[in-house]
Each structure stands twice: as C-alpha cells, then as structure tokens.
Amino acid sequence: MRLNTLSPAPGRIHAKKRVGRGIGSGLGKTAGRGHKGLKSRSGGSVRPGFEGGQMPLQIRLPKYGFTSRISLVTAEIRLSELNAIEGSVVDIETLKQAGLISSVIKRAKIFASGEVKKAVTVKGLAVTKGAKAAIEAAGGKVEE
C-alpha cells in the first residue's frame, strides 16, 4: 500500500452536480432553481435574520450586558506556563519578555492548571489559592 494508491471506498465520493448542461441531465435550463423570483437569480438571497420586513427577533429582544474594559488589559496565566520563563522571578515584565502576554496587558492572574517544575518568586500578580499552594510546594514564594 502506498499513499498514491489510496482511494476512497466505492460509493463514498459523489460526482459534483453539473447544472445547466441540457435537459437530459435533469438539471438543465433553470438548473434546479425554479422560475423567476429572488432565489433564482445570481446573488439573490435574503440576509441572515431577515424576516420579510417583520421586526427581526434580534431587534425585538432587549440589549443586555457589556464588555468590561478591564478585561481587555487582564490576562490569565497557567502554572505550566511559568516553566517557560527564564530566571526565577515572575512579574508582568518577565511574562511579556517570555511572550506569554501581549504588551497591552497591565495585570495578570495565575491559576492552577498544570504544574510548576521550578521554584519561582511571583511579584505583583494575582494568584489563586490552588496556584499559591502549588508554587509554595515547588519551593517558590508569592509576594504582593
């Protein structure tokens, strides 16, 4: 068996419908689109959510919620990602240098996902209870 001899099981692949190629094909002339009307024409279809002029559902329902602007400058860091950082001190600047967060991020929180394999000192970052326990178990410490 070689890659160039592989083929799908018989009946697995259906031939593409070729429309507008004579009445004997069953898809000639109008090509399965019927006669006239919006949907028979090229580019002819109503946009998603259009209900024929009736007030659409997404407009009938009330608006709610908002996007917190502080979430745009906040990042979440996994414990396992701390292993990629050179050195033993972890703060916002070292996270940016390691490429774990973008330059616009101003605050970050470390949460317990994976495991940290080296002793690190966390400075100026929020840390969950589980992550703090894991960092201290690995010989590191968390400073405010």
UniProtKB/Swiss-Prot annotation:
Protein name according to UniProt: Large ribosomal subunit protein uL15
Description of how the protein assembles with itself and partners: Part of the 50S ribosomal subunit.
InterPro entries according to UniProt: Ribosomal_uL15, Ribosomal_uL15/eL18, Ribosomal_uL15/eL18_sf, Ribosomal_uL15_bac-type
Record-linked PANTHER family: 50S RIBOSOMAL PROTEIN L15, LARGE RIBOSOMAL SUBUNIT PROTEIN UL15M
Entry keyword annotation includes Ribonucleoprotein: yes
Functional note: Binds to the 23S rRNA.
Stretches the record annotates as Disordered: 24-52
Top-level taxon: Bacteria
Cellular component, GO annotation: cytosolic large ribosomal subunit
Alphabetically ordered keywords of this record: Ribonucleoprotein, Ribosomal protein, RNA-binding, rRNA-binding
Signal peptide from the UniProt entry: none
Family: Belongs to the universal ribosomal protein uL15 family.
GO molecular function, one term: rRNA binding
GO biological process: translation
